[in-house]
Amino acid sequence: MQRSDPPRPLLEMRGISKTFPAVRALAGVSLTVHPGEVHSLMGENGAGKSTLMKILSGAYQADPGGEILIDGRPISIDGPLAAREAGVAVIYQELCLAPNLSVAENIHVGRELRRGNGRRGTIDRAAMARGCQDVLERLGADFGPNTLVGTLSIAEQQLVEIARAVHTRARILVMDEPTTPLSSRETDNLFRLIRQLRAEGLAIIYISHRMAEIYELSDRVSVLRDGAYVGTLERDALSAERLVGMMVGRDISGFYKKAHAPYDPGNLLLSVRDIADGARVRGCSLDLHAGEVLGIAGLVGAGRTELARLIFGAEPRVRGEVTLAGKAFAAHSPREAIDAGLVYLTEDRKRQGLFLDMSVRENINISVCGRDARLGALDLARGAQRARDAIAALSIRVPHANVNVGALSGGNQQKVLLSRLLETKPRVLILDEPTRGVDIGAKSEIYRIINELARAGVGVIVISSELPEIIGVADRVLVMREGRIAGELGGRTDAPITQEAIIALATGSRTEASAAH
């Protein structure tokens, strides 16, 4: 029996290079994508993924020597309009929509329908609404074409972007980290839509750092590293170890490996009893032991972050008791908590954690600069050495300590923030979504740091929406639902820590009693 020939590629990018002043972002990268395929693109931050896609979208011009082919024909993409005419649409992490315009107006932007005399005619909003109604229905939208975009949720706005791509008859759809702002239910809906578009013959280039998404969606995965093409894996050949090794250029066996000794249940470090804020947290209790990594899981809105901020003292509590190292603890501010040895890494590093217009050195030292004061002046040399030591210890990729934090990748920003917290010598460290938006290499570094802290006797609480992460790093897992602790997995219970058990507790289909037996 003869095997059928594979379909002709819809997109071929051959030998694509891009040089910026003093930096070569891409070096002869090639990528082939077929119709009806979800082709994932992976690599660490700075690997060249975004640059390659910006060349495809017309935002950047490639260096001479490479070529782009669609349906086997070379084309020139010299700007976003040329990309759109070639059938390319890109949905970025930051959605490109006008919130004060309707859904129909956003879908038709740059292609407005007019009455009368060409471009001088008045915009025909009714015709635009009629023209995109069928696309919205086809994609399962539960809002109409005249809905104001600013009133929609992030997931619904993302659907508007997809509708715009479909309406322009895009054949190649690029999606850059599309699930970052979405809940698990919204993510499931997005995946359903992606499969629908794939079945209709679209070629989808999917960029993500999340392994579970890559496994679930991908037909093939291509990996970039340091601006160069490393290779492409078929779906059947995918494994976390192989992908990570391709991305970082070295073997990372046991990606989530617990490399610390079992904690001592008799060495209680933090005790929380019946803590509540009167709204999102409704009476939670937990224990954390020295050398333990405690995971907190739950759906978006379950109250995980609010619980962490209550313990830390960033929000007032209406009731409850907290004991730290055997002493009553009632921080009225984050400063008091830090001085007592309890620190919190926020889930929103850019708005609540980092000073983006300040240097790496300043960000690392800002929580402990009082130690360096001599006769009212800061010891800058001591602060500079502290920053250099932190950069080396956490493998922060930065040319020097005086570069602004805002110029760094997400993973390096996270490590700067983490290094600042570690300079306070904490006894308890609460990490809220510690690997959100960071690449695989940075994730492995953060997991290494968590293990080192646990080995040193620090109690670590990890809040994460990535279930493989929670399962991989935590000794025990508490699952929250609607502001309460719904159940405990692992530890002294008989309930194993599994994705199914976490989801069951988080959604209410499993009770605390059934989780423990």
From Swiss-Prot:
EC nos: 7.5.2.7
Gene3D superfamilies, per the entry: P-loop containing nucleotide triphosphate hydrolases
Membrane topology: Peripheral membrane protein
MF terms in GO: ABC-type D-ribose transporter activity; ATP binding; ATP hydrolysis activity
Family, per entry: Belongs to the ABC transporter superfamily. Ribose importer (TC 3.A.1.2.1) family.
Subunit description: The complex is composed of an ATP-binding protein (RbsA), two transmembrane proteins (RbsC) and a solute-binding protein (RbsB).
Name of the protein described by the UniProt record: Ribose import ATP-binding protein RbsA 2
Organism phylogeny: Bacteria, Pseudomonadati, Pseudomonadota, Betaproteobacteria, Burkholderiales
Gene of this entry: rbsA2
